[in-house]
Amino acid sequence: MNIRFLIRSAARRDLESLMRLAPQASLVNLPPDEDVLTIKIARSLQAFSTSPPASAEYLFVLEDVASKEVMGTSLIIARYATPRTPHYFFEVRDTPGGQELALGVCTSGLSAIGGLVLDRRYRGMPEKRGKQISLIRFVFMGMQPQRFEPTVLSELMTPVAPDGSNHFWDALGGRFTGMSYAEAFELTRQKSRDFIPRHFPVTPISLPREECGLQRNRDQVLDSGKPEQRILEKVGFSFSRRVDPMDGALHYETRLADISIVKNGRYCRVSETTRESCGQSALLGFMHGDRFFGGQYPVQVNADNAALPGEVMALLGLKSGQQVYLSLLD
């Protein structure tokens, strides 16, 4: 393992890097908009403070310390569903003739993860940097569970056409609202989803078997999203049989307390050792003031002591006896 990478909370200096990464993924919560990203960084800095707002969003970046290059991002939204910003979904129900979609709404009890982007140049490598920047969110949630809701949601995107259209939207939402997918996407980015209860039917929508392209199941995930799907399933998430009413994105959910990274996490005191002495691998995280640092590193855990290679201690600025939150990996 090349020990020159760390994960940290986003800083103002990361704006240029985020502007470079954002176009690589069509994400509502990480758009390639300088003004929006500037606000997101400021909101994240406030979130990591000792008294975060209820609407906190936590933005993480994966950095190559040698080159000072940011190559990945991920995000936690502490309160994803509120009375002011409801979370709408379709519940997927199997019927003798196919499926039906029933509109539902949630206004509390839900945190969400998103904003996952890994620079294309680093995808498919054995170090699995994307897995690290994804799982680090659960390290922080394990450190500070009181900041989050009991249930955690991740939306896994379904395919979008080369021209930017979405078959699911064109067949359903576009028909009900008269809007294009791009128009609806922009409203969603602005956290304005009032058009859904205004225009969508309250009675279930039938999808006959011949409409197989509209029916939802766990296999309908973008190829680029399948690694994240496998990661989520391994740590405890499953398809909730709910989908986004706009684009049909699959909703993966679990209880925060049931996420394996959280269940297996604990605080340890660190000490220094050699890399050769470390026969385990772990995700770890800690706060330095209002800033988060962490990553995946070799370790040797004995009771409440975690021995780390000297180069990891130096990279993270850790001192012997300092406390970190740690979750061993298989």
Tell me the role of every PLM-derived stretch.
Residues 172, 181-199, 205-220:
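Long, charge-rich alpha-helical interaction segments
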Residues 6-18:
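A short beta-loop-alpha structural element at the N-terminal edge
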Residues 118, 124-141:
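Conserved acetyl-CoA-binding loop-helix of GNAT-fold acetyltransferases
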